[in-house]
Each structure stands twice: as structure tokens, then as C-alpha cells.
């Protein structure tokens, strides 16, 4: 036991009480600092993840979509210029690509699967499967500073970045070692579904499933949408 000369017991108890009080304060402060640091770290990680998701879903500064059945098959930039909107005055680079309709529906593509769509996707089964040529896809990827994808004649790929249909597209790719589009039979080029964004719609709902085919195959297909891609 330690005795301090010149200090009475009351004073010693006061010192001990103050030390215990300060220890509790320091403990609480350290706990709060730990919680704050963790919260900031989690918040920063979440923000970075959301920013990355947003960037992947919106790879262009602008895209203008034109429904061919309504607007006709036209040059979008020329149409805008004729209406006093000259995109080239503002844009660093532009590309126009086209999306076609296959001669099959998504229900035919998903044949043999037990599918359950979200309410927003109730019209998907009866919709024609979207098709894009490999050249147009690579033009879109170049706008995003991405490397081109190689596809040989007689081959096809599937692209999808929408959670509501991704698993069905992945299963369809596995069950279709070959597929016929526009009267041309194509062999599966890869076993993995691509997850690229070639046009922008709403975040998380860019592509419910698109066939990527050689340029020659699209010649016999009906064009559905033209898209002007713009980077400022």
C-alpha cells in the first residue's frame, strides 16, 4: 500500500475519483471517434461504389435516341443541325449507331427456362430481341476509351447489364451453342455474357439482352433505333 506524506485520505479519494472520471471521458471520446471514422470510411466506400456504378451506366455526356418507326432512318446530327442545334459546335466526338430487331422474341430466346419477370418487364417476353453489329458496338466502346471486341464471321455474342434479365440471358447463352438470326446460323463465340453499355436509358436498365452479330447479318434485319452518342 502506498502512503503519500502530507495528503489526507479525502484528497487522495478526490484525485482517484478525478482519474476515474477522466478515464471514462477518454473512453467515451475514443469510442465516438472510432464510430465516426468507421462511418466516414463506410460512407466514402459507398460513394465510390455508387459513383463507379453511375459512370458505367452513363458512359457518354449525351445520347439522342431516334425511333426509326416514328422518325424514319435518318442522320440525327443532320436533323438537329437543320433545327439550329449544331452538335459539332459543342461535342469533342460523336458517333451514330443503330439497334436492330431480331426475328425472334425474348420468350423464344428463353425457351425451356422458368422465368419470372419483374412487373416493369412484363412486356419483355413478346418483344423482339435487340441486335447490334460488332462495328457499332466497337464504335460505342471507343467512345468510352475501351478496347474493341473481336467477333469472327459466323459467330455471335450476348450482352446484358440489367439485373432483371441477366440470369436468363446467361442461361440462354449456355443453351444456345448456335443461334439463327436473319436466316444466318451463328456459333457462340464465348460462354460469358458481356456487360457493356452501348446506349443510355435509365440507370440499371440499359440492356435487357442484346445479340452482337457480324455486320453482314444486320443487313436483313429491321432497324429499331438510331442513337447519336456524344462526348463533350
Predicted regions: what they are:
Residues 52-232:
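Nucleotide-cofactor and metal-assisted catalytic machinery
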Residues 16-19, 35, 66-68, 232:
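Short, flexible loop/turn elements at secondary-structure junctions
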Residues 1-30, 36-40, 44, 48-59:
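Feature of multi-pass inner-membrane transport and sensor proteins
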Amino acid at each position: 500500500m502506498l502512503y503519500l506524506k502530507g495528503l489526507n485520505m479525502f484528497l487522495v479519494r478526490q484525485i482517484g475519483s478525478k482519474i476515474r472520471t477522466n478515464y471514462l471521458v477518454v473512453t467515451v471520446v475514443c469510442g465516438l471517434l472510432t464510430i465516426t471514422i468507421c462511418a466516414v470510411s463506410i460512407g466514402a466506400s459507398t460513394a465510390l461504389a455508387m459513383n463507379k456504378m453511375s459512370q458505367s451506366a452513363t458512359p457518354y455526356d449525351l445520347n439522342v435516341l431516334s425511333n426509326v418507326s416514328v422518325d424514319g432512318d435518318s442522320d440525327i446530327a443532320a436533323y438537329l443541325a437543320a433545327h439550329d442545334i449544331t452538335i459539332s459546335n459543342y461535342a469533342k466526338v460523336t458517333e451514330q449507331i443503330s439497334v436492330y430487331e431480331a426475328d425472334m422474341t425474348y420468350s423464344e430466346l428463353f425457351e425451356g427456362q422458368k422465368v419470372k419477370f419483374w412487373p416493369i418487364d412484363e412486356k419483355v417476353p413478346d418483344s423482339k430481341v435487340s441486335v447490334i453489329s460488332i462495328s457499332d458496338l466497337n464504335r460505342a466502346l471507343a467512345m468510352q476509351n475501351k478496347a474493341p471486341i473481336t467477333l469472327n464471321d459466323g459467330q455471335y455474342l450476348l450482352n446484358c447489364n440489367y439485373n432483371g434479365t441477366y440470369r436468363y440471358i446467361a442461361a440462354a447463352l449456355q443453351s444456345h451453342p448456335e443461334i439463327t438470326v436473319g436466316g444466318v446460323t451463328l456459333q457462340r463465340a464465348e460462354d460469358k455474357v458481356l456487360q457493356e453499355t452501348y446506349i443510355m436509358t435509365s440507370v440499371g436498365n440499359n440492356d435487357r439482352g442484346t445479340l452482337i452479330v457480324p455486320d453482314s447479318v444486320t443487313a436483313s434485319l429491321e432497324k429499331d433505333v438510331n442513337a447519336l452518342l456524344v462526348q463533350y
